[in-house]
Amino acid sequence: MLLLLDLGNTNLFVGVYRKRSLVCSFRTYSDKTKSSFEYQEILSQFLKNNNLDLDQFEGAILSSVIPSLTRKVALAASSLLNKECKVLGNQLKCGLSI
């Protein structure tokens, strides 16, 4: 499974995908005052509420338009899953021209 995060100016959209299918999703407000730990707790609660096992995740991917929150949310996801959270951007080697 993959944890996908889309961090926008107003909302953080979170989705869980298994074999190209959306398993579950939710939305919460983007809040620059929240810490990485607070975002980790939000993500943890979402996964627990949906009975998802952390060991089944291959990692996380984050897209963000808020530079000041990108690191916090990426750290929250990687700490929770104990796996890398890739951040989409011009430095990520994905085989596509951006």
Question: How should these model regions be labeled?
Answer:
Residues 1-2, 59:
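Residue-level preference for the first positions of well-ordered beta-strands
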Residues 2-43:
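Short glycine-rich, Thr/Ser-proximal phosphate-binding strand/loop in the N-terminal lobe
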Residues 18, 45, 75, 79:
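Short, well-ordered alpha-helices that flank and scaffold nucleotide-derived cofactor binding pockets
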Residues 23, 44-48, 80-82:
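Short, low-complexity, polar/charged sequence segments that are solvent-exposed and flexible
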Residues 39-55:
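A short, N-terminal amphipathic alpha-helix
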Residues 50-98:
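Short beta-strand-loop/turn "lid" adjacent to the catalytic site in phosphate-handling enzymes
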